[in-house]
Amino acid sequence: MSRVGKMPIALPSGAEATITAEQITVKGPLGSLSQALNGLVQIENASGTLNFKPANDSREANAMSGTLRALVNNMVNGVTKGFEKKLMLVGVGFRAAAQGDKLNLSLGFSHPVVHAMPAGIKVETPTQTEILIKGIDRQSVGQVAAEVRAYRPPEPYKGKGVRYSDEVVVIKETKKK
């Protein structure tokens, strides 16, 4: 059995899980998330803990139990605490400004870059060079952060560009004559 799939998920106070044949829905103080189920994994809700078991002894069912457990754990954490990614702009004249559900970026191009946020994602700019992306869906938060970073990834010689706050950019040495 999968090592990850063996571990039960304890539902914190304020979070509740509803399991049907097709999907699992987790509701919490920040919102609700749903995940489609397949027949390879059985989920039991026993007094505030969720247990995951493969439906049969196949390798696929074993792997899916660990995968589904990780996805549901992220859903529980999302609806109770939420997720956030912090991006930094490094470079002269690089600026960011949040306006409602849009993020205006000035990244050294001849035109401003406007990134529209999907539903359920909030963006803040504490300073002009910091971007904070928040939401309850871990996958969506990471996807939006990756899309914003892709506009101007850090270049290896000076390190200019959009980077994650915990990202380490290895600076290359310039060519010598």
Curated annotation (Swiss-Prot):
<comment type="similarity">
    <text>Belongs to the universal ribosomal protein uL6 family.</text>
</comment>
<dbReference type="GO" id="GO:0003735">
    <property type="term" value="F:structural constituent of ribosome"/>
</dbReference>
<dbReference type="InterPro" id="IPR000702">
    <property type="entry name" value="Ribosomal_uL6-like"/>
</dbReference>
<protein>
    <recommendedName>
        <fullName>Large ribosomal subunit protein uL6</fullName>
    </recommendedName>
</protein>
<keyword id="KW-0687">Ribonucleoprotein</keyword>
<dbReference type="InterPro" id="IPR020040">
    <property type="entry name" value="Ribosomal_uL6_a/b-dom"/>
</dbReference>
<dbReference type="InterPro" id="IPR036789">
    <property type="entry name" value="Ribosomal_uL6-like_a/b-dom_sf"/>
</dbReference>
<keyword id="KW-0699">rRNA-binding</keyword>
<keyword id="KW-0694">RNA-binding</keyword>
<dbReference type="GO" id="GO:0002181">
    <property type="term" value="P:cytoplasmic translation"/>
</dbReference>
<dbReference type="GO" id="GO:0022625">
    <property type="term" value="C:cytosolic large ribosomal subunit"/>
</dbReference>
<keyword id="KW-0689">Ribosomal protein</keyword>
<comment type="function">
    <text>This protein binds to the 23S rRNA, and is important in its secondary structure. It is located near the subunit interface in the base of the L7/L12 stalk, and near the tRNA binding site of the peptidyltransferase center.</text>
</comment>
<dbReference type="InterPro" id="IPR019906">
    <property type="entry name" value="Ribosomal_uL6_bac-type"/>
</dbReference>
<dbReference type="Pfam" id="PF00347">
    <property type="entry name" value="Ribosomal_L6"/>
</dbReference>
<dbReference type="GO" id="GO:0019843">
    <property type="term" value="F:rRNA binding"/>
</dbReference>
<dbReference type="InterPro" id="IPR002358">
    <property type="entry name" value="Ribosomal_uL6_CS"/>
</dbReference>
<comment type="subunit">
    <text>Part of the 50S ribosomal subunit.</text>
</comment>
